[in-house]
Every structure is written in C-alpha cells, then in structure tokens.
Amino acid sequence: MLSVAPTVGGGGRAAAQETPAADAAGAEVAPATEAVAPGPDPNAFRVHFGFEGKAHYRDSEQLRLPSPFPFPPESLPPGATQGFLESVNEGGHFELSVLTLFADASWGPNIEAHAKLDFIDLYDRNPTSSDKQFDVDELWIRFGGDPAAPVDGFGMYARVGKFGHFERQNDRHTESYGLVSTAFNRFEDQGLEIGANFGGHFYLVGSLTQGNPVFFRDPNALAGDNGTPENDPSLHDHPVPELQSGFPILYDAEVEDLDVDGDLETGYGLGLRFGEPGSGHEVSFLAWAYQRKMAETVALNGTFYGGDIDLLNGPQNLFGLPIHGNDKKEVGGNLWIYQGGFSFFGQYVQQEIAGMDRTGYEGEVAWRFDLPLAWAAGGRQLFPYLQPVVRYSFLKPEFAGGSPRFPAPSVRWEWTKLDYGLRMGIIEGVDLTIEFADNEMTLANGSKVSNDELLTTLRFRM
C-alpha cells in the first residue's frame, strides 16, 4: 500500500512511496524539522505608554506667625494691621494631586526617548492656586547606552531635553520630599547631559543646562501662595486669600520657558559603584557640583514675584537678604546602598548663593518585606509587600545681616524634618502610603515651632 511521509530537505513537499512492510510492522517516518520562531529584534522600534494617578488625604497642622514686613494696608485683609506667615491650607482635605501620562520609545539599545506629562500637578504648583495645571515634566532623547545599565568596557551617552538632575534620588519611598531634595534637586532642568562609563565601576557625568530659578516654597505638600494675582493690591484691595503663604524656604524652582541666553549652569559628577545596577545588591557614590550666574530677575508663572536676584533683594530692593554678587554654587555627595529589600539614600550639600552660605543633609532608610501569598484577585496577589521608611533631613542657612524685614523670615531658619511612613502594596499597580512629616524650625530668637503634616497617598499605575 502507499504511505505519505515528509522528505527531509524537500522544501515541505511530501513523497509517495510503496512500503509493503508497513501493514505488518508500521513504517518509520522521518521526523519533521521544527521551525524555530525568531526572537524579538533588539534593534526594532518600540513604543510604550503608561499612566499614573495619585489621590490623597492630607491633614496639616495650623501655625501662624507674624511677618516683619510692613505690608501696606490695602494688601491686607479687611481690618488686619499685620501680615502673617501661615500654614498653606490647615486641617483635613481629600484631594487629587496629579494624573501622569508616560511615553517611552526606543530604537535599539542606543536610542531612547522619554516623555512625562503631568495634569493637575497640585503639589508641584507654585503658587499653588495660580500656577499652570499642565506641565511637561520630562521630555528628552538619549543617544548611547542606558547610564544605569552595567557596562563591561567603555561607554558614552548624550541626553538632550528636559530631565532630572543626575544626582537626584529617583526611587523615593515616600510621596513627600526631604528638605535637601526640596531645596536643591526636586525639579527637572533642561539642556544637555553627557556621561562616560569606564568599565563596571567608574563613571563621569557633566551637564550644560538653563538652570533652575531661585524661588521659595513651603517644604510640605502644598507650596503656598505668594505673589498671586488674587493677592495683588494693585488689582484687588484688601484681598482675602483662600490659601496662605506657608513657611517657605529657598529652593531651585521649575524651569518655565526655554531660555539659553546668557550664562548657563554647568554641572559635574564623578561616580563610583559596585555591584550590578538593578540587581538589588549595589553600592554607589557620586561627588558632584553645579555653578551658574543668577539673573537679575526671572519671570515665573502665576506670581508677580521675580526669581533669582529679584527675590533675594526683597520688595523695592529695600528689604533684602545680605547678598553679594550673583554666583550660585553647590557641591555635594550622594550615597546609594541596596541590599535585597533594604535601601539607603544619603545626600550632603554645601551651597553659596549670592555670597550667602547654606548647608544641608538628609538620609532615607527603607526596607521592603515581601508577604506570603494569602489572597489573590484576577490572578494577582493581594497585599504583596510592606515597606516602612524613615527619612531625616536638616537645612541650615547662614544668612546673617541684610534687612530684618524680609517678608519671609523662614528662609533664614534652621530646620529639621523627620518623615516616617509605611507603603503597602494592595495589588499589582496599586499601593497605599501613609506618612507623617515632623517639622521643627528654630526662629531667630531661639524658640522652636512645628508645622507637621499627615499625608496618605493612594497611587495607581497601568
């Protein structure tokens, strides 16, 4: 009888041949050659989108202290004779702070682009009530390998656009920020960053950027309202603000429009790391520095106050801080340690800003505990982990001299902030963080005051 068997190398054609013995014993059939599915092309163009939202319950302690500035009567609420620094929005509040759209594109391992678009942006807005509610937080393209990826030999990269400072802590374990992170590297800058890796341990990085303007904000969740159109006495007599000034510190604010005229900020970093990045077992140290010339003024969205020298000079250039020149310099060192579920981040900074000195340091310890599988939903574990976190930060301005009537004496205060909290995974892509900020400020007369805050954050990602 006839049987049909594939022929090896026959291009998929079958050959018919007589096999008389097949009726008795069966015929051996040559095995078919299995087609191996090709793997994904590592050089293919890929695009990925993501989304994140954050909802909160915030409870802020009430604190009200007199401002030494002689506000004109028309700029004060009806019947008031004195201006005050006051908690931005005391009491308990439910609020949606941000909706974020992410977009990532890559073309092989050496070309990558990233965009991060924020909507609402409540906790980044400054002033809180009048700043823009949409922000292009990051927008950059990188040529060369990922600087965080392990490299056996020499490698270089260049990144251009709007991106975070290279020394910034990008894996913060709370929703809040420490004093040092708030003051020096919370917000992105825009320009050019170049880096080089030398084997697996040593790397260099440098940047040439626009430079974040100097402004002030409260270190708690809400930045506060200072210089808003609603509080402008030339537009509204005796305004009654819904949000208050807060207790602002000087900080590097968000860059607004692209401006590369004049002096740019230069940054340098020298790093040393051990262990494989992303493996959970890594130690990394980075020494870094920035310097630039401050502008006479910088226009900022939502406020009639100017940034840089204009802010430091005070109203009418008569009630300023003790500034000399326009140099702005920072020198710092950062340490990251990862060991399994344990992580540590530390940062120390010395700053000279228009002849005034300021130092600060902070350290954050977190430990993630993976929980055993007890419940699941939709094939995903419920309550997969717990992560307690503690952070201590300290900021010491040395701004002696100048006018005692500068409107925000809080920029001169010695400040300590202890943040402690717990992050709990609810299900993949959803977590809950409960944290408490214990603020202690030392006033000019040596007395101490507090401006504490409880913050609960429900974060969802997809």
Name each model-derived stretch.
Residues 2-84, 375, 462:
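N-terminal periplasmic/intermembrane-space "pro-region" immediately following the signal or transit peptide
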Residues 20, 25, 30, 36, ...:
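Intrinsically disordered, low-complexity regions of eukaryotic proteins
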Residues 38-65, 86-222, 262-266, 272-279, ...:
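Outer membrane beta-barrel
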Residues 99-131, 192-260, 323-358, 362, ...:
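Glycine/serine-rich loop-strand microenvironments at binding/catalytic pocket rims
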Residues 77-82, 123, 185-190, 233-235, ...:
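Short, surface-exposed, polar/charged, turn-prone segments marking secondary-structure boundaries
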Residues 58-83, 167-179, 210-336, 412:
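Outer-membrane pore/translocation modules
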Residues 72, 181-183, 192-193, 226-230, ...:
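Short, intrinsically disordered/low-complexity patches at protein termini
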Residues 20-21, 26, 42, 62-63, ...:
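Outer-membrane beta-barrel pore domains
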